[in-house]
Swiss-Prot record:
This is Pup--protein ligase. One of its GO terms (biological process) is protein pupylation. Coiled coil: none annotated. The gene is pafA. It comes from the Bacteria. The reaction mechanism probably proceeds via the activation of Pup by phosphorylation of its C-terminal glutamate, which is then subject to nucleophilic attack by the substrate lysine, resulting in an isopeptide bond and the release of phosphate as a good leaving group. Belongs to the Pup ligase/Pup deamidase family. Pup-conjugating enzyme subfamily. InterPro entries: Pup_ligase, Pup_ligase/deamidase. It comes from Jonesia denitrificans (strain ATCC 14870 / DSM 20603 / BCRC 15368 / CIP 55.134 / JCM 11481 / NBRC 15587 / NCTC 10816 / Prevot 55134) (Listeria denitrificans).
Amino acid sequence: MTRRIFGLETEYGITYAHPTDDVTLSADEVARQLFKKVVAWGRSSNVFLRNGSRLYLDVGSHPEYATAECDSVEQLIAHDRGGELILVDLIDDAQRRLAQEGYTGTIHLLKNNTDSAGNSYGCHENYLVRRQGDFTRLADILIPFLITRQVVVGAGKIMSTPQGPRYCFSQRADHMWEAVSSATTRSRPIINTRDEPHADAEFYRRLHVIVGDSNIAEPTTFLKVGATDMVLRLIEAGVPMRDLALDNAMRAIREISHDITGRATVTLSSGKTVTAWQLQEMYVEKVRTYVESLGPLSPTDEAVFELWERALRAVETQDHSLIDRDIDWAIKKRLLDRTQDRLGCALDDPRLARLDLAYHDISPATGLGHRLVSRSMMNRVVSDAEVERASQVAPETTRAHLRGRFVTAAQEQKKDYTVDWVHLKLNDQAQRTVLCKDPFAHVDDRVDQLIDSMRTQAT
């Protein structure tokens, strides 16, 4: 597909730090406080917003934000970051109310993937693919890529092991149990095969990737989604690809993550052994050859290739300075290394654990991301203005535009309505419903008429 629909679903960790409070608040209680403002206007903790996104409380009191449908990687990043702005606003509102009730602690919303109890929550990537074609072939080619891409797009994690603490590439790697499955929590596959296209099922299916880490640095998300998109283009074009299947995928994903030198070797089904960066090089070379054969590269493709190849060079040479402003695991490692040197402490020191968490804290007041950007220690892909707009306005080039307009009009006219990814429904006497099955369609006369009817009734 030369044009693709993308989406990110991010589950957030939530905690309440209370150094002086006598009464603590559980994650459930904090989550309820966080969503009070949402429930007040939406009458539910599961709502679609004016910017086309979905915001809800997931299992385990994890706030989850699902971006609207986006048709470029840059647009997706803006809307992912826009979700952070929305959640920070909810944090501030809940914080004020708790302060009025005498609570002096701080709510922390963490864009990470594991908690102190060993539970994992995810960042799920969604890629629209055409129904035609062999999905088994797609998965077979994609799985080795997804397992090894952690060396260039992992979020980094301090992990306790029987051999002592170690710094790993990925937060999600140790929580994966299958390559492909229709489950999401019980067995946690790399690719979820549950067939929910949120589009015309005759033509499309939704590739649901749940192996990835949640990223703080925008360039890491840019590479994660951009490189995956280009590998999908290669597969969809039917370009022959040598068999890179791993002999033991679940062992490989863990062994790769645990060796921050990038030199851990994994065994292919053919019996050959390779490192993760060598396997990634095979993909990037094949993809570059294919994409360049189609004509001049787009600025986005150029930027993806540049960062992808630079990140692999950093892993191969161990020169992390090549990427320690762009790639999460390298940025965080630089911070941890400097702090460890300054304090003269071990990697399992609680102060380093707090630093690790602060890296993933999305609040400008308590998190590190905003400070790193302001000090030129973390690069950007999109502007503050683009993020601010994305927090309020749906993408104008996809179906999300229709949903955003409908939700905005219904709220302004105080109409009762129901929405999901495909349906727009007015809960009036006529129960009028519009089915929007084409995720690329941003213009629809039926939606225009539905919106006009609301405004006509109001006059």
